[in-house]
Design a protein with these regions (language model features):
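Conserved pre-catalytic core of RNA-dependent polymerases
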Residues: 4-237, 632-647, 662
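Short, conserved catalytic/metal-binding micro-motifs enriched in Asp/Glu and His
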Residues: 31-42, 91, 163, 180, ...
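Catalytic palm active-site di-aspartate
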Residues: 35, 72-75, 91, 126-130, ...
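Short, conserved micro-motifs composed of acidic
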Residues: 210, 298-348
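Basic, alpha-helical interaction scaffolds
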Residues: 334-412, 467-480
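Extended C-terminal regions of large enzymes
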Residues: 420, 435-617, 621
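Short Cys/His-based metal-binding microdomains
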Residues: 456, 614-662
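Active-site metal-binding core of divalent-cation-utilizing nuclease and nuclease-like domains
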Residues: 616, 668-708
């Protein structure tokens, strides 16, 4: 492999400006764990003296004079899984000084920009630790599209997932220096990193004991802001070697001109090939690279393989003979890594970046797991000893958040999603104090329309899928753009699954039409102006999701219009909506009052006319005014006796609001009129001479008293 050419984009090694330093400080989270000195980021944000002192220290450290405490770390062990007695099942997290992390975060941002602008980091391959890149979802979407394409075109595909043994802790410091030199990083930054890694010391701290201070001779700190980028540079050496085999060994899509071979997210690497032979050659290349590093090694026990092939005659699969005429089925490719055969994905699933993969590529087991865990979460929330509206808050912020990732990576049919929503509706109505047959729109419609504005599971799934399609279409990775276009052009597949791509295209078209309408409604009224308005990508995505939410609320309104009695809240448009924010739901408001308001908005409060309708009483008269039809609308707004007794405070407020408008207009006109100030001068006169205008005190006359 040849060394890459020198880049035209140079890395900025100048001292950071005060504005750049301020952005680095304010980008940090206040809740981040501090180092051994106990000083967190909030100190530098709130104290100007500490801010100025740290800025002067960073300017001095920019020349290579790094403080000793920046290279000291307290290592905390976090348990991962399996056996707690095995030290290998713990993840070491280094807690470092916040001032040092601010210094290295400035360098990390500049180094990342340098690697991307120079073309050393390829977005289509390595997506780990890159700012603004949803790497997990993009790689999962790419691999799913490849498996779906091979299945629809009946072509062979071989996938191998490689896991490294202690990836971050096995990178030698000499290898880091080699990667910096290989990618033409300026010597100024390379010397700073070399000095920093020569000073690394750490102690392991637990609740019961602390170890002695030891030198960190190999590996990078997990918790240092610079470590992920340095590891990616070392791992990028392997990706550059594998990229030479992309056209030769990679899998080529049938519907678009895209060839993929290796997908990496940090140390998680997957190899996609068109044949077993080419896949094994790529694995041999990985073995050769790991042996060259002398410190890094694969972990065969956690590596997996999968192969899919079109079978058209009698064959032997999974250890037994099955006679299949035409089938597209998996088989064990028996790939080897580090001299050991990789395990085949059989009945047990393999998790790739949070996506569970089965050998049959079916998602029925995932549906059962999601359904089971969702019911367990709802039962757990229902069993807590808090009032119902606090349970609604737990559902809104925790239970729905659990469904976010499965809804993004799995293709689920709407009927199955609706079943989850029916289960959720039973719990939500119970917690809100609604009747079992109450209309469900009161749970999901906006608060200004007498609703709780909770997350609808169906709408939440569509929102995530539309956001996923938007990401595929506008991703900087060109391969994802082409895959999205092929998905949009494909028809007939997955009929039961709701297709987000056409829905996203329609919503984006609506956003574009609104922009055009804004151009036609300006002062010129001539359509587009001289410059066409363009939205940023984040703003465009936000408007697309807002359009999706508006369409969902419009569907709820159509359902409420169909409900003649429970949709009566639509007639309360002039009434001031009840404040149903979380601050009042779980804090200041009485839960019984909120429950009554919700039931009243859907006409579920027991009234005389409903009792007569149900056959519980012979008459539906109002108990106050003896009106013949005492409906909920009459009780709330139309009873004259209640009006005289000042029970309708909202009605008096509406009268005052009607009087307020002309008074406000009159006061505005009076305040806008010019005010002429009267100039008064003091007139002096001699004491002997009377003034020209004699002031006399006039007493009221008799006629004046008579007029009064």
């Amino acid at each position: 492999m040849r060394r890459p050419v020198k880049p035209t984009f140079s890395l900025n090694v100048e001292r950071p400006t005060r504005a750049e330093f301020r952005r680095a400080v304010w980008s940090k989270r206040n809740a981040a764990s501090p180092g051994r000195n106990g000083i967190n980021y909030l100190v530098y944000k709130k104290l100007p003296a500490a801010f100025d002192l740290l800025y002067s220290i960073i300017l001095k450290a920019w020349d290579g004079d790094i403080p000793d405490n920046w290279a000291q770390a307290a290592v905390v062990l976090l348990f991962k899984d399996e056996d707690p007695a095995d030290p290998a099942n713990y993840r070491p997290i280094a807690l470092q000084s916040c001032s040092g992390k601010i210094f290295f975060s400035i360098w990390a941002k500049r180094l990342e920009l340098f690697m991307l602008k120079s073309g050393y980091f390829k977005r289509a391959k390595q997506k780990g630790f890159l700012s603004g890149v949803p790497g997990c979802s993009e790689h999962v979407a790419t691999l799913k599209a490849a498996l779906r394409d091979s299945r629809s075109s009946y072509r062979q595909i071989v996938v191998a997932w490689i896991d490294l043994k202690n990836a971050f802790g096995s990178v030698s410091h000499n290898l880091i220096q080699f990667a910096l030199e290989w990618y033409h990083v300026p010597t100024h930054l390379a010397d700073i990193i070399s000095t920093y890694y020569e000073m690394l010391v750490a102690t392991i701290e637990t609740k019961d004991w602390s170890s002695k201070c030891f030198v960190y001779e190999i590996g990078v700190f997990q918790g240092c802001v610079l470590s992920p980028l340095l590891f990616s540079m070392v791992f990028n050496l392997l990706l550059d070697m594998l990229s030479l085999r992309t056209e030769e060994a990679g899998y080529k899509f049938k519907g678009c001109e895209v060839t993929i071979h290796d997908l990496a997210y940090a140390d998680d690497l997957s190899i996609i090939s068109r044949s077993i032979t080419e896949a094994q050659r790529s694995l041999d290349l990985i073995d050769r690279f790991l042996r060259w590093t002398r410190t890094m090694a694969a972990k065969p026990s956690k590596c997996r393989s999968l192969a899919l092939k079109y079978w058209s005659n009698a064959d032997d699969r999974a250890g037994r003979t099955r006679f299949v005429e035409r089938a597209y089925a998996p088989f064990d490719p028996e790939l080897k890594i580090a001299g050991q055969v990789m395990k085949f994905i059989a009945d047990k699933s393999f998790k790739f970046l949070g996506w569970k993969v089965y050998h049959h590529l079916s998602e029925s087991k995932q549906k059962k797991e999601i359904h089971k865990e969702f019911v367990e979460y709802m039962d757990k929330v229902d069993g807590t000893f808090v009032h119902g509206f606090m349970k609604l808050w737990l559902y809104q912020h925790y239970v729905v958040a659990y469904l976010a990732w499965p809804f993004m990576v799995y293709d689920l049919d709407i009927s199955w999603i609706s079943e989850l929503e029916r289960i959720a509706n039973r719990y939500l109505k119970k917690w809100a104090g609604l009747y079992a047959r109450a209309v469900t729109s009161v749970l999901y419609r906006p608060r200004d329309m007498f609703g709780l504005q909770l997350h609808s599971i169906v709408a939440f799934y569509k929102r995530l899928q539309i956001g996923q399609s938007f990401m595929l279409k506008h991703s900087p990775d060109e391969n994802l753009n082409r895959i999205y276009l092929s998905m949009l052009a494909r028809h007939g597949a997955l009929e039961r699954v709701w297709k987000p791509s056409p829905a996203m295209e329609k919503l984006e078209w609506q956003v574009e039409q609104k922009l055009r309408f804004g151009g036609q409604a300006d002062r010129a009224c001539m359509g587009f102006g001289r410059h066409k308005r363009k939205l940023a990508l984040a703003e465009r995505k936000r408007r697309v999701l807002e359009a999706q939410a508006s369409s969902f609320f419009a569907e709820l309104n159509l359902l409420d219009i169909d409900k003649a009695m429970q949709g009566c809240f639509l007639r309360f448009t002039d009434a001031e909506p009840f404040d149903l924010s979380w601050r009042h739901l779980i804090g200041t408001r009485n839960p019984r009052l909120i429950t009554w308001v919700l039931n009243a908005s859907i006409n579920s409060v027991v009234t005389p006319d409903l009792r007569k309708l149900w056959g519980l009483c012979p008459s539906a008269e109002c108990l106050l005014c003896c009106h013949s039809q005492a409906s909920l609308f009459h009780i709330l707004v139309g009873c004259p006796v209640a009006l005289r007794q000042l029970r309708y405070s909202w009605r008096h407020d509406s009268v005052l609001a009607t009087l307020e408008e002309p008074l406000r207009r009159r006061l505005g006109q009076h305040n806008a009129s010019p005010c002429v100030e009267e100039k008064r001068t003091i007139q002096f006169h001699s004491a002997n001479k009377p003034s020209g205008k004699r002031l006399e005190r006039r007493l009221p006359t008799k006629n004046a008293y008579c007029s009064i």
